[in-house]
């Protein structure tokens, strides 16, 4: 009696790298999961990335976090007509503590861009600017919260592209999860897919352009959109029921 041969290809084990555009993640996480202190946000980021690992039933290669160091310049505020020392601001302290907390996390690599550059100008946020132009807001009614510092990131997109290319060429992973919202990394994503890597985008419910959709293998969010995200265990009101000790090594 001859046994039938099983010609099915064995399923390959999935090894995943999670790449996080820091500026994008911080903005979307604050909108979906609430504002948190630096240490809470760092722990939340790890827990959120673990969700992707569990969804893929994968092993984690590493979490790459990309951001720029906080700005410490002295700039002029047009409303108060005062010089503002950004190095002594709450945002500077928050970012410094946040990046420090991330560097202490297991399997997290923090990739810093160049020092943030600015023209030294505060600009009006979109909402008060529209109200001002429509006449529903008067100049004398403007407040400090209506302004935001005009900041340009440098070096972050380049580092993301280099890491994607390195992961693909050295065959270190067979899946990449990219938490981002723009299309600047599309050329690197195309290279990764040509190398056989499953490329997943997590835009955290931000809109995705057609050109970006064309060059990824799928979209997956690991958080519900508002208002359902208010019930998420990672929401600040629920005090992060999913957070685990850093030494927990499941899939890590």
Which residues are covered by each model-predicted region?
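Domain-level signal for Mg2+-assisted phosphodiester chemistry and nucleotide/NA-binding surfaces
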Residues: 2-131, 144-145, 149, 198, ...
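Nuclease catalytic cores that cleave nucleic-acid phosphodiester bonds
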Residues: 11, 112, 116-252
């Amino acid at each position: 009696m001859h046994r039938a041969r099983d010609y099915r290809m064995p399923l390959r084990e999935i090894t995943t790298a999670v790449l996080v555009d820091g500026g994008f993640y911080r903005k979307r996480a604050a909108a979906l999961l609430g504002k948190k202190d630096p240490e809470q946000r760092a722990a939340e980021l790890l827990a959120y990335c673990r969700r992707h690992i569990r969804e893929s039933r994968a092993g984690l290669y590493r979490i790459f976090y990309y951001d720029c160091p906080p700005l410490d310049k002295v700039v002029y505020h047009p409303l108060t007509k005062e010089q503002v020392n950004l190095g002594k601001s709450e945002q500077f302290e928050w970012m410094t503590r946040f990046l420090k907390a991330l560097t202490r996390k297991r399997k997290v690599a923090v990739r810093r861009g160049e020092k943030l550059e600015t023209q030294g100008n505060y600009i009006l946020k979109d909402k008060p600017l529209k109200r001002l132009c429509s006449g529903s807001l008067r100049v004398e009614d403007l407040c400090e919260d209506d302004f935001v510092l005009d900041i340009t990131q440098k070096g972050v997109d380049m580092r993301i592209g280099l890491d994607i290319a390195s992961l693909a060429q050295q065959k270190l992973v067979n899946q990449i999860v990219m938490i981002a919202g723009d299309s600047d990394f599309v050329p690197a994503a195309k290279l990764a897919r040509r190398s056989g890597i499953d490329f997943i985008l997590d835009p955290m419910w931000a809109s995705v352009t057609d050109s970006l959709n064309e060059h990824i293998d799928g979209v997956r969010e690991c958080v519900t959109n508002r208002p359902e995200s208010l019930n998420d265990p990672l929401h600040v009101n629920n005090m992060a029921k999913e957070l685990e000790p850093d030494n927990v090594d499941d899939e890590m």
